[in-house]
A protein has these predicted regions:
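Glycine/threonine-rich flexible loop motifs
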Residues: 5-15, 79-80
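Short, structured patches in soluble enzyme cores that scaffold and shape functional sites
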Residues: 2, 10, 25, 66-73
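Catalytic nucleophile loop
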Residues: 1-2, 24-44
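Glycine/Thr-rich phosphate-binding loops of Rossmann-like dinucleotide-binding domains
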Residues: 8-9, 42, 49
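C-terminal and late-domain segments of enzyme folds
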Residues: 45-47, 51-151
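A short, gly/pro- and small-residue-rich
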Residues: 13-27
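Hydrophobic alpha-helical segments and helix pairs
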Residues: 1-2, 7, 20
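Glycine-rich nucleotide phosphate-binding loop and flanking beta-alpha elements
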Residues: 5-6, 38-40, 75, 109
Length: 151
């Protein structure tokens, strides 16, 4: 599902569906999520773009993948804005969470985990990865091997 990630996580936790879906996915059931639904596939909701309109019991999500997901990623910079960019916010997150990795995926793209291999699908055909160990972020294309994110 989509919508507000905080609301989705609260409802998934309240109904017991967070753990139920997680278990079914680990048992082999395909999982597909977009927007908030992709956020909840990661370990926590900490890299959502949403406002905290409600408070879930915790920020813990399904952990179907070992990295954070930031959907709707854009590296657009408006010089008139004067505020933080998405890159600034994601870099701040990994600085205070040194073991974290964030996969920032653009509109109309998705991550496909199949048979133990991870790939980017869709257009535009690039995504960004933010890691504390990297001095700069790295961009990856459709043809790149993304299996390193699974480690």
């Amino acid at each position: 599902g989509g919508g507000n990630t905080f609301h989705l996580v609260r409802e998934l936790q309240r109904t017991g569906l967070l753990q139920a879906i997680r278990q079914r996915a680990f048992d082999g059931m395909p999982y597909m999520g977009w927007s908030a639904g992709s956020n909840v596939a990661g370990p926590t909701l900490c890299t959502t773009n949403d406002m905290p309109i409600v408070m879930p019991a915790s920020f813990e999500c399904m952990g179907l993948v070992p990295f954070q997901i930031n959907p709707h990623y854009t590296d657009f910079f408006d010089p008139k804005h004067g505020g933080e960019t998405r890159d600034d916010r994601l870099k701040e997150y990994i600085m205070v969470n040194p073991r974290a990795t964030v996969a920032a995926i653009r509109e109309a793209t998705a991550l496909l985990l199949q048979d133990g291999h991870l790939s980017l699908i869709g257009k535009p055909n690039k995504m960004k990865v933010f890691k504390t160990r990297m001095e700069n972020t790295q961009e990856y294309a459709l043809t790149d091997n993304l299996d390193f994110l699974l480690k």
